[in-house]
Amino acid sequence: MTDPRILSLQQAVPALRLKTEPADLEHYGRDWTRRWTPNPLAIALPGSVEEVQAVVRWANAQAVAVVPSGGRTGLSGGAVAANGELVLSLERLNKPLDFNAVDRTLTVQAGMPLEAVHNAAREQGLVYPVDFAARGSCSIGGNIATNAGGIRVIRYGNTREWVAGLKVVTGSGELLELNNALVKNSSGYDFRHLMIGSEGTLGIVVEATLRLTDPPPPSNVMLLALPSFDVLMQVFAAFRAQLRLEAFEFFTDRALEHVLAHGAQAPFAEIHPYYVVTEFAAGDEAQEAAAMAAFETCMEQGWVSDGVISQSDAQAAQLWRLREGITEALARYTPYKNDVSVRISAMPAFLAETQALLHDAYPDFDVVWFGHIGDGNLHINVLKPDATSQADFVAACDQVTKLLAQALQRFDGSISAEHGIGLVKKSYLWSTRSAEEIALMRGIKHVLDPHLLLNPGKLFETHDAPTNIPAG
């Protein structure tokens, strides 16, 4: 029997596409965490901004919670619909809308995949420089909702730096046009930046105007083998002093083992405990000489044990696969993921402390580390032992996150660097944000989403949001 609320929605928005088949509910109701059982009311697939507004207004009238949905590649449970929410998928809003050659901006719908954004920019002789391994699956709206970073933050920064303007539907169904792609705008609060990183709890991004830039010069990729993590910052400093770095990524021997088992080619005859893949501007003899000088300095100091530099685009892709292939290689284990950040200078001490802490507390766990050294972001993947039940594993991993949160508080770090808080990390927001900050977040949500219907339960609990803040 069809739920009467679905019939009501069909009557309110007659042209709206709806999906209610069990397979669709499961597909659209979860993200890559695979931790919660999906249980959405239905899947709404609007074909216009006006339909998004109409759905949100209907949700307010019917008191139905709404979960905005993009590519659902998130790793924090931010797109999970497990409590009868209406999933509002933006996948049909997936087209480029406008290119402005003078402003060098590209306006796109929020459901457009990141890879399609890259292609659209490339067609104009420019680039949108934010990039990560899930580029073919993730949507630009989801990137904005989490202020995603990726592999080239060291050169280009996070998503936030490249958003010139937004169109956002608020929790009451109003449409906000934020900043209008202005370069300078000193006219009060910039609500664009409030929406970026808000995880769909304040509004639904429906369109984005993105800044584009010139294509980078030709680059080389170098893979370095390190004898210990303690020397990593010396290697980073040596290369940063000589070269314009595009990326500087690290991973462990355990990460490499999983990627090699997944079909990648071994880069060296011997296994080393730590690796760095770095990309830097090249194209002339001076840059190549600088790269070799940095490498030789590191070898002489004993900071690097071995290295290889790409001689072709194909070899560069092979070297990058060793880093970008980690997530795919680990996927079959359904790892418990943590995505944390500390100041770059604090990374060696933080990693040493947390490695020892996790080894002592959970010696049977296989912990795989990799991350973005250039911006202080570490990814910690815990793999379930075969002899451990899923329930016991999740319970133990919750304790892992608690230990990490306590360590991050000591190091003034963040429990989420780029994946967002979602459901996974909301119990540990205290390690990153003060009680006063969290109270202000709740107050802001109440103003923009007065019935607390947008992505409820994500980022923080909303049942106790204040009710005495004026909406006007």
Swiss-Prot record:
Q: Which UniProt keywords apply?
A: FAD, Flavoprotein, Metal-binding, Oxidoreductase, Zinc
InterPro entries (alphabetical):
FAD-bd_oxidored_4_C, FAD-bd_PCMH, FAD-bd_PCMH-like_sf, FAD-bd_PCMH_sub1, FAD-bd_PCMH_sub2, FAD-linked_Oxase-like_C, FAD-oxidored/transferase_4, Oxid_FAD_bind_N
- Record field: catalytic activity: (R)-2-hydroxyglutarate + A = 2-oxoglutarate + AH2; (R)-malate + A = oxaloacetate + AH2
Q: Which Pfam families match?
A: FAD-oxidase_C (PF02913), FAD_binding_4 (PF01565)
As to how many cofactors bind and how, the note says:
Binds 1 FAD per subunit.
GO molecular function ontology, one term from the record: FAD binding
Sites where the protein binds (R)-malate = 323, 327, 337, 419
Question: What are the required cofactors?
Answer: FAD
Residues holding (R)-2-hydroxyglutarate: 323, 327, 337, 381, 419
One GO term under biological process is: respiratory electron transport chain
- Annotated ranges, domain FAD-binding PCMH-type: 36-215
What range does the record give for the signal peptide?
none
> Binding residues for Zn(2+), per the UniProt record?
372, 379, 418
Give its E.C. classification number. 1.1.99.39
What controls its activity? Activated by Zn(2+) ions.
Query: Would you identify the family this protein belongs to, as annotated?
Result: Belongs to the FAD-binding oxidoreductase/transferase type 4 family.
Summary of the function given for this chain in its UniProt record = Catalyzes the dehydrogenation of (R)-2-hydroxyglutarate (D-2-hydroxyglutarate) to 2-oxoglutarate. Also has a low activity on D-malate in vitro. Is functionally tied to L-serine biosynthesis, via its coupling with the D-3-phosphoglycerate dehydrogenase SerA, encoded by the adjacent gene in the locus. Active in vitro with the artificial electron acceptor 2,6-dichlorophenolindophenol (DCPIP), but not with NAD, NADP, or cytochrome c.
Known partners and oligomeric status: Homodimer.
Protein name, please?
D-2-hydroxyglutarate dehydrogenase
